[in-house]
């Protein structure tokens, strides 16, 4: 039995099977120009019973045993065709067989083809009963796909299921180019299993052999097969030389895994990255476990830590079972706060301030749903590791619509908050929220009147440390009951734009909302889960200023806004603009002295927001938004982008984003917003571009500049060359990777990456632009 040892060579050939890049139609069509296609009518089913047709210039024989055909001999049966200068037909009776065995020997310019392969050589043999075929000292070419080579002997077996090569070679390069090839003493291609087995395999670049393996198994189709994927290498200032060698494991039809040894020179060890994917009756999920046994750099930088092991565990699951049960997991945990600064990972970033660990189980039937969940946070700040977790939380909703003209709902929540620090307050919170709605609507407008009661009870513990250090004392038991009343009206007006743009339609959509919530002093309640909600135009019409339930601001306000849209004759939205404001009749308060703007006693028009989108053409788009808050005395946030996009490989985008330091302080958790890099807010201008610059060459670049710090924030440049049988990519990235508190400046990481992949084994001809765009620390977002 021949020993089977998976080797690195499988990596270099199997890559196309697992690639997720899109198609580059131009390159794909160019590559297929050199590939033969099957141009005869395809015969379906069993072709062995079909008649054999023989055409030749001359024929002679001893009927019925032997016959010799010479001169342009052409033999056809079903999808198979054999041509040669001379063919000798032999027919013999076989004991126990109803039909005689018919074989042919072919000499001179032998050409065999069917809908799978073309074989050419000076000598051939075929069994017309079984379709077994031999061709000696010739070459072969796959039909309808890239793949060709040579062999001392080429055999078709198993009714064209197997192609067997003795001392053969394989390459996906087009005729005239042997950039790479695989040579083996025996190659067996199984079309049903979509796998090729190669013994004594040598991988060649041009005529030079560079790698040997006694056995190689590689996928040659879309069927999942275990094997090595393409290796990657890069150099970074954080880890120096890095090398990845991923292995794909097809465990079962409903589960697979990718195991990647990741060598990092500076760390002095190999990180094992293990990604597991599964599909079950309870849903689909993905798990990732990365483990570095020891890290010499971390050990030097943190001598007081008992262990230098670094690890990450990620689990994402979502599923429904029996149509009523819902299961969700969103769990990320790392060994230490510096993990995402030291290692690139798609499940977290150096700009993240925390990792979330959330589990939930839900039950839902008509008019009712309930969810039990737990939520924890791992804070990465070394200055303040305080954070609250919900252990556990119960949410219940009951709906009953069409109660006369009304819709009703009752929402309830019970949650227990625990802090990571022993001296911080903890609480059990119970909340009940009955709601009644009166919805009225017609073709041109709607009005929704809503009333609800917000009743919350707190039982707070562990208050001694906090109360001893603050003037405002927390209460062990606190109740808060407040009604809420809201009226929300909308109208939609529509007109044809025949004078300016025939076929176009414009809408005018005014909206007005009145909201009333009485003031309740919440200073005796600690803030466990509330923060200021980010606002855009639609956010102006929210009921709440804060997320969570610990801070419910009073409201006596009117929100007004208007949206206008323009649709073309194909009902595609070409333009929209929205502008709105909140007018406060009385100040919005919670009684919390830590909220600075509550001390201003401001009323009137305090918050403005606007959004716009303009699809100038099918290739040009403009998008922007702004929020102004007089309580912050400045623009709170703004963003804008303009983009030209010809297709997924040809695009240019300019963008700008801004967030004031006051806004960041108000919206983000305290342990996150006090980080030094956010004290001046965010003000970044950037550009992203992707374009094929020459035949088969493409380039991707991104550059972001921090106008507050007057320095580069992030940049990336990638270049890829793509051909029909290989692609090479080189990339450079400089990105923000944390903050040095001692030196009070940002820390950057520089990375140079190199990647090579073999093409032609699948339909992947992507130019690599989408993958390079996604790799940036600020990923590209489509404006159109």
UniProtKB/Swiss-Prot annotation:
Keyword Cytoplasm in record: no
Keywords noted in UniProt: Cell outer membrane, Disulfide bond, Membrane, Signal
Compartments, record wording: Cell outer membrane
PTM info: Contains two intramolecular disulfide bonds.
Disulfide linkage: 31-724, 173-725
Main location group: membrane
GTP-binding among keywords: no
GO biological process, one term: lipopolysaccharide transport
Coiled-coil parts of chain: none
GO terms for cellular component: cell outer membrane; transporter complex
Listed Pfam families: LptD, LptD_N
Span of the signal peptide: 1-24
Similarity field: Belongs to the LptD family.
Biological function: Together with LptE, is involved in the assembly of lipopolysaccharide (LPS) at the surface of the outer membrane.
SUBUNIT field: Component of the lipopolysaccharide transport and assembly complex. Interacts with LptE and LptA.
Annotated protein name in UniProt: LPS-assembly protein LptD
Organism: Escherichia coli O1:K1 / APEC
């Amino acid at each position: 039995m021949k020993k089977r040892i998976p080797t690195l060579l499988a990596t270099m050939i199997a890559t196309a099977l697992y690639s997720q890049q899109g198609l580059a139609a131009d390159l794909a069509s160019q590559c297929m120009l050199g590939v033969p296609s099957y141009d005869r009518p395809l015969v379906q089913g069993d072709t062995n019973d079909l008649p054999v047709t023989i055409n030749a210039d001359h024929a002679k024989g001893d009927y019925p045993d032997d016959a010799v055909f010479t001169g342009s001999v052409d033999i056809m049966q079903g999808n198979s065709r054999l041509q040669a200068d001379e063919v000798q037909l032999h027919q013999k009776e076989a004991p126990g067989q109803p039909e005689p065995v018919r074989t042919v020997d072919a000499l001179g310019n032998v050409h065999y083809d069917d809908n799978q392969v073309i074989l050419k050589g000076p000598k051939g043999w075929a069994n017309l009963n079984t379709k077994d075929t031999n061709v000696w000292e010739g070459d072969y070419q796959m039909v309808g796909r890239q793949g060709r080579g040579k062999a001392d002997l080429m055999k078709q077996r198993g009714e064209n299921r197997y192609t067997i090569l003795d001392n053969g070679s394989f390459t996906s390069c087009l005729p005239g180019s042997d950039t790479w090839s695989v040579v083996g003493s025996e190659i067996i291609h199984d079309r049903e299993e979509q796998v090729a087995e190669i013994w004594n395999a040598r991988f060649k670049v041009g005529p030079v052999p560079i790698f040997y393996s006694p056995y190689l198994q590689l996928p040659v189709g879309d069927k999942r097969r275990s094997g090595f994927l393409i290796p990657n290498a890069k150099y970074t200032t954080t880890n120096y030389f890095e090398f990845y060698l991923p292995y794909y494991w097809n465990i079962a039809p409903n589960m697979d895994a990718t195991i990647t040894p990741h060598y990092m020179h500076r760390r002095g060890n190999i990180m094992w990255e293990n990604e597991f994917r599964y599909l079950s009756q309870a849903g689909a999920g993905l798990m990732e476990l990365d483990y570095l046994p020891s890290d010499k750099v971390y050990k030097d930088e943190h001598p007081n830590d008992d262990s230098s092991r670094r690890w990450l565990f990620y689990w994402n699951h979502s599923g429904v079972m029996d149509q009523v049960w819902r299961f969700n997991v969103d769990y990320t945990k790392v060994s230490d706060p510096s993990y995402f600064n030291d290692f690139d990972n798609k499940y977290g970033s150096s700009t993240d301030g925390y990792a979330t660990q959330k589990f939930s189980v839900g039950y839902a039937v008509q008019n009712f749903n309930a969810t039990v969940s737990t939520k924890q946070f791992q804070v990465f700040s070394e200055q303040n590791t305080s954070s609250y977790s919900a252990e556990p939380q119960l949410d219940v909703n009951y709906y009953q619509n069409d109660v006369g003209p009304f819709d009703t709902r009752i929402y309830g929540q019970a949650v227990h908050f625990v802090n990571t620090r022993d001296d911080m307050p903890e609480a059990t919170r119970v909340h009940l929220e009955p709601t009644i709605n009166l919805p009225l609507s017609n073709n041109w407008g709607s009005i929704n009147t809503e009333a609800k009661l917000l009743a919350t009870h707190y039982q707070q513990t562990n208050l001694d440390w906090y109360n001893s250090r603050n003037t405002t004392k927390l209460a062990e038991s606190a109740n808060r009951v407040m009604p809420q009343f809201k009226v929300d009206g909308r109208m939609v007006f529509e007109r044809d734009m025949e004078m300016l743009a025939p076929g176009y339609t414009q809408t005018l959509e005014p909206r007005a909302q009145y909201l009333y919530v009485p003031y309740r002093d919440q200073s005796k309640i600690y803030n466990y889960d509330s923060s200021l909600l980010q606002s855009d135009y639609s956010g102006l019409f929210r009921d709440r200023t804060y997320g969570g339930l610990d801070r419910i601001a009073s409201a006596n306000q009117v929100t007004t806004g208007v949206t206008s849209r323009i649709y073309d004759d194909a009902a595609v939205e070409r333009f929209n603009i929205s502008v709105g404001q909140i007018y406060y009749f009385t100040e919005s308060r919670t009684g919390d002295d830590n909220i600075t703007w509550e001390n201003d006693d401001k009323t009137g028009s305090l918050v403005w927001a606007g959004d716009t989108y303009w699809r100038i053409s099918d290739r040009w788009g403009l998008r922007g938004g702004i929020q102004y808050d007089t309580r912050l005395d400045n623009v709170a946030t703004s963003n804008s982008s303009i983009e030209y996009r010809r297709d997924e490989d040809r695009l240019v985008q300019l963008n700008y984003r801004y967030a004031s330091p006051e806004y960041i302080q108000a919206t983000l958790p305290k342990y996150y917003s006090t980080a030094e890099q956010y004290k001046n807010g965010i003000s970044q201008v950037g550009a992203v571009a992707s374009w094929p610059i020459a035949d088969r060459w493409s380039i991707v670049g991104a550059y972001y500049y921090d106008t507050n710090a007057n320095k580069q924030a992030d940049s990336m440049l990638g270049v890829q060359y793509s051909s029909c049988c290989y692609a090479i990519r080189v990339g450079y990235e400089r990105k923000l990777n944390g903050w040095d508190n001692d030196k009070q400046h940002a820390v950057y990481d520089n990375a140079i990456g190199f990647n090579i992949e073999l093409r032609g084994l699948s339909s992947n001809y992507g130019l690599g632009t989408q993958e390079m765009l996604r790799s940036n620390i600020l990923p590209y977002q489509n404006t159109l």
